[in-house]
Amino acid sequence: MTIHTTRWGQSGPTVICIHGSAQGSRVGGDGHFAAQQVLAERGWQLLVPDRPGHGQSPANGQPDDAELDGAWVADDLLANLPGGAHLVGHSFGGAVALAAAVRRPGAVRSLTLIEPGMQKLASRDPAVRRFGMQLLAIKYLSPSAAQRARRFAAAVGIPPEIGGAKSRAELTAMGRGLFRLKVPSAATLQRQLADVAKAGIPLLVVTGGWHPAFEATGDAVAKLGNGTRSVIASPHHFPNQVSDEFNQVLATFMAKVDARRTSAVAF
């Protein structure tokens, strides 16, 4: 499998950033995590892959699938990093990062999930139920694939400058990708988060405070994975892009994790 990967920085602990979105988008990981490039100047090295069918990575004949993507993140990236890496996943990429973490827990220094697409874990919350019904209507009742992509982006709070869709052809491809996208079941996510907690992988869950469904989901994910919650004020689905606050929170979290690891090895 050919995966295009952007690298920022040449030294320091490794951070792997996994983006979300739907196949057909010409925006890759470097677009979704553009504001994190400055971390390379602060002692971190970042690996930012384009998932299959996104950005510069060719499609692999499969839909967006957290399990399949998690496998190559674990086996092609984590497996080749002797010191392991911190994993960061946004939206659907959060499900990918989670799948990778449970596949190779010993190689994961920490796991950070930004507005993870795991609403099935909070389906009892009224805001999440309404949001879920809205997304189902968008998926099945949109008059065209292009309209599906437009409506989804509006509902999920994806800014045009980040979400791509610069042409009708790209919109159509993304709308088709959204229809085929495979979201993990609640049972799968529960099991994986339990595995993360059992393995003692430090977990940080970040949301932007702009949508109650993402807040309820973030709370549920953090509870199941024995993680820490952080809310970084954002008007949309990308709290990692609105200011440097996310970078500061993430760097502090990862540095504390690494310090504890170093201390444990010393003893």
Regions found by a protein language model. Name each.
Residues 1-58:
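Conserved HGGG/HGGXW glycine-rich cap/lid loop of the alpha/beta-hydrolase fold
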Residues 45-86:
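Active-site loop/oxyanion-hole signature of alpha/beta-hydrolase fold enzymes
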Residues 87-89, 114:
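Short beta-strand immediately N-terminal to the catalytic nucleophile in serine-hydrolase-like folds
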Residues 89-93, 97:
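Gly/Ala-rich beta-loop-alpha elbow adjacent to hydrolase catalytic centers
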Residues 102, 106-140:
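Flexible "cap/lid" loop of the alpha/beta hydrolase fold
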Residues 143-183:
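Conserved alpha/beta-hydrolase catalytic His-Asp/Glu region
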Residues 167, 176-225, 230-239:
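Conserved serine/cysteine hydrolase catalytic core
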Residues 225-267:
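Catalytic active-site module of serine/aspartate enzymes centered on a nucleophile-bearing elbow/loop
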